[in-house]
Amino acid sequence: MDDDNGLELSLGLSLGGSSGKAKARDAPLEPKAEPQVEESSSKGGLQTPDAPSGKFYQKSADNHEQNSKQRHSPVAPQFGNFWGQPGNSSGPVVDGSVEPVSHQPQLSSYQDGRMPINSGNNSEEQKPVSGNHKLPSEEMNFQKKHQTASDQPDAFSKSSDGGAKNAPISISTDDGSTGENEDVAESEAEGSNSWLVAQREDSAKGSVVNKGTDRKRSADAAADGFKGKRQPSFSGSESSSGKLTPGNLISMQASNVVALPYQVPGQVSGPPVLTNAPNFHPVCTVQLRPPTNGGLAVQTMGSASQVAFGYPAVQLPTLETGSSWAFGAPPQALSSFTAKDKADQTGTKQVDDGKKPREAGASSSAHAEDEKKADRGLSLMGSAIRPGIAPNVKFGGSGSYPDLPWVSTIGAGPNGRTISGVTYKFGRNEVKIVCACHGTHMSPEEFMRHASADAPAQDNSATLPAFPAGNQATSAEN
């Protein structure tokens, strides 16, 4: 491709691909080297043998200058060679070299060892061409770099484990500065790594939030269990986050749990209903948990109720509305044994309380029996002793007392008379009589003999004075 000035703008210009055209256009430049050699040979005859060596040094210097210019000239690698893969299309050949550009190393540092040493004519021909076309080739190289950079795939290829691998990127510029591109790649890699770290942190936060919500759900389920609700079953995949395994239904129990060494009946009688007890506290219900794995049954009760240990039955006593303790405190769960014990205690108390009236009754009955015996003794006496005071009785002492238990008898025989006396209880089954005429204490038999046989002796006795008949009337009036 040629522009208006006839300059070639192909990629192979910097590598010497168009050497034929350069020779045709720059042919007048070749005779310049020959006059210099002739002048140097004409200056001295001794220098003619050294002319070939001087020409050789001049050519080697020209080649060194050419190599330095080619080193600084921009090289536009193909896309296949950029990624380290050999290109399929044949590139331009450098100065008759058999190897194409694609098979030659792309780095400029390796080009010096493999560049062939060309003749002086080729070096002289490429000098003005490389000098004149340096600026357009740099512009094209800059455009090519932007195109290849835009056509390149992402430098970060995701590996199988989710990480990011950095592709080896080294873009050589005309001044040999590859560090900027590498810095850009490293900054992009750091940005992608930070993005991955942020994604992992977000996922970790999400898992923490999920665990927190799972714990909250389990706490809510526990709170629902205390209310008596049935717990739902969870899938097995959720067991790792603190949830329940499938098929396990757990009813939350109360705090006071007592293991009993016997089977407790599943049904418990409900609390008694009180119609006239508005201020009475509700009775604590008894919950029974069925035995698990063939173990012991567990009885759970509220904290307000007492637990009876070691007894088979759990009963609630019936309440009496008229009792004094019915409205004071809530009833307690009692076993049959404790209820029986209390019944025995109350029975013994009743027996103890009943002993006192029995004793009192026994004493009264004994007194009644004594009275009956006394009456029986009086009845045995027959009609000889009668209650009351005889009309012609003679009193000794200060007078008579009509409120006393008076008795009277009539003596038998020719000397018999009517005497009176006061009875009193001398012993448990014994009654004595005090005669009014002498004041002598005697038994009923003695009292009867005194009335019949002792009448003459009474007249002769000085201890018992005789009272006139007028005293009887006064005593009767009193």
Swiss-Prot record:
Pfam families (UniProt xref): EAR, TDBD
Q: Where is the composition biased (Acidic residues)?
A: 180-189
Biased region (Low complexity) positions are 233-242
Q: Which domain of life is it from?
A: Eukaryota
InterPro entries reported for this sequence: Ninja_fam, Ninja_motif, TDBD
Could you tell me the keywords of this UniProt record? Nucleus
Q: Name one GO cellular component term.
A: nucleus
One example of a Gene Ontology biological process annotation: negative regulation of DNA-templated transcription
Residue ranges annotated as compositionally biased, kind Polar residues, are 169-179
Disulfide bonds listed in the record: none
Query: Region Disordered: start and end of each range?
Result: 1-247, 336-374, 454-478
Q: Does the keyword Hydrolase apply?
A: no
Where in the cell is the protein located? Nucleus
Query: Bias category Basic and acidic residues: which stretches?
Result: 23-35, 339-359
User: Which family does the record assign?
Assistant: Belongs to the Ninja family.
Q: Report the protein name in the record.
A: Ninja-family protein 7
Q: Which organism is it from?
A: Zea mays
Q: Which classification does the entry list for the species? A: Eukaryota, Viridiplantae, Streptophyta, Embryophyta, Tracheophyta
